[in-house]
Amino acid sequence: MAFHEYPVTQDYRISRKVLGVGINGKVVECEHRQSGDKFALKVLRDTQKARREVELHVMASGHGHVVSVHDVYKNSYNGVDCLLVVMENMKGGELFNRIQERGQKAFTEREAAGIVNEICSAVAHLHRMSIAHRDLKPENLLYVTTASNAALKLTDFGFAKKTDESEPQGLKTACFTPYYCAPEVLGTEKYDKSCDLWSIGVIMYILLCGYPPFYSQHGQPMSPGMKAKIKSGQYTFPSPEWDCVSEAAKDLIRKLLRTEPTERITIEQTMEHKWISHYRRVPDTPLFTSSNLNDQREQWTDMQDEMEATLASMRVGPENIQIKSLGDSNNKLLAKRRKGGASPKDDPMDDIKEEEKDDEEEKMIS
């Protein structure tokens, strides 16, 4: 994988504006010195896992529904090697936040179908290259701009993995977000690209009603009851939210949420399903989604925090999966996020800023 080895600050001005926090690193805004264009900069410690993330993201880059990678740098700060990934700046925000911000404007089934079509387009692109994303969730689906017709794009390849002959053992490392993970991910079975289809089914379910099909009744990232529901495929289409949803939509959800991976619909079959292939003809029926997401805004934020904690602190054993609570997690990144601000300690971004500051001062002196 090719990358620049000279300082990123030669090409970009680095801002302290945090755009997001991924499982493997922080994302801040940066500005290209020559063009003045704004980009997103992700900082990763240079590890084999980070290189895999960057390599797969670069491979997938260029598709209309995948966040583009523009530059990659390898720099060292205080003796720590880092990869700095310059990406497209997604100014439109996260998928469900966009729906929450609609206010009284109705969100329709036709709009939901259009969104799922965009997500499926990105996943189909990955699967054609034998890449499983393995972390499909609303926070990783971002809009390019705030315009109503802005494109939705997939990002964060921190758990992505090749599924072809280069991975002879299959995907047997359990990387997942509880609310969106497939049953086979919860056990010791191997799993593959079909886990992405399960995640699409969960996202589609939430888009059509405003709440997830599987949840923890005790507010924990993964309760035994929630785990049992996922493994047995227990979910319903309750009234009144689902009374107005088309049978075609419910049919696709049933095919996506099948517990047996070999029986689950593929991404190609999903794209051919009439609810997706004819998404412009889907009924323009108003849904309860927007009001439910707003009514549960506080719970939704807590759920996102739980998912992030789980992603960063999961521990996989041969017989079971143990997930630390956020309070027990020793992950510094999550602790900073929970406290509402980043501590400057051990943050490569601060070293980058100091280096840039020194460069600017040298220019002023000379």
UniProtKB/Swiss-Prot annotation:
InterPro entries: Kinase-like_dom_sf, MAPKAPK_C, Prot_kinase_dom, Protein_kinase_ATP_BS, Ser/Thr_kinase_AS. Interacts with pmk-3. It comes from the Eukaryota. Changing residue 285 to E: Phosphomimetic mutant. Defects in motor neuron presynaptic and PLM and ALM axon termination and increased cebp-1 mRNA levels. Localized exclusively to the cytoplasm. GO terms for molecular function: ATP binding; calcium-dependent protein serine/threonine kinase activity; calcium/calmodulin-dependent protein kinase activity; calmodulin binding; metal ion binding; mitogen-activated protein kinase binding; protein serine kinase activity. This is MAP kinase-activated protein kinase mak-2. Its main location: other. Residues 13-276 form the Protein kinase domain. It comes from Caenorhabditis elegans. Belongs to the protein kinase superfamily. CAMK Ser/Thr protein kinase family. A motif (Nuclear export signal) lies at residues 301-317. Serine/threonine-protein kinase which is involved in maintaining synapse and axon morphology as well as touch neuron axon regeneration after injury by regulating cebp-1 mRNA stability downstream of the dlk-1, mkk-4 and pmk-3 signaling cascade. May play a role in body wall muscle contraction. Plays a role in the formation of muscle connections, also called muscle arm extensions, between the body wall and the motor axons in the dorsal and ventral cord. The active site is at residue 135. Its EC number is 2.7.11.1. Residues 344-355 have a biased composition (Basic and acidic residues). SUPFAM superfamilies: Protein kinase-like (PK-like) (SSF56112). Residues 356-366 have a biased composition (Acidic residues).
